[in-house]
Amino acid sequence: SAGKDKIYHHQLKVKADEIACVDENCLANGTFLKIENTPFDFKEFHEIGERINDDHEQLKLAGGYDHSFMVKDEDDQLVLYDKETGRKMTMTTTLPCIQVYTGNFLSGGCNRKGGKPYENRDGVALEAQFLPNSIHIEKEPKVILRKGEEYEAVTTYRFEVE
């Protein structure tokens, strides 16, 4: 985004029923939250800014969205849409999670083109991955690759203008 209105008006849809909860260090803590009727319920399109400041413990811990959505094994697991420009990004992955990070701590970091500094929530990152911190919280973490083993994952990003 990095545009004039941060990322608040971007519409997000995610095919997930739960998120991985985070602790005070924003690490997945091994618990999961059913997202129905919470600020994390993006099963239908919602503007990112619509509920980002709601009084919810997980939003407070992360300063916004910085959570792994446990996506369903389906196509088009995540769609990000900018109604103003018509730009749409659709994401599908074979990995179990998509991390949605709303740039909650961008201030004081790098500058954008033209030298203007980024501010909090000036962008959104959408990252296909295994569950963060899974090496410490899963009985049989899939993030370990041993000598001789092979690893394959596929993530596709499709961009369109409507």
Would you name each region that the model predicts?
Residues 1-162:
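An exposed, glycine/acidic-rich loop-and-rim segment of catalytic or binding clefts
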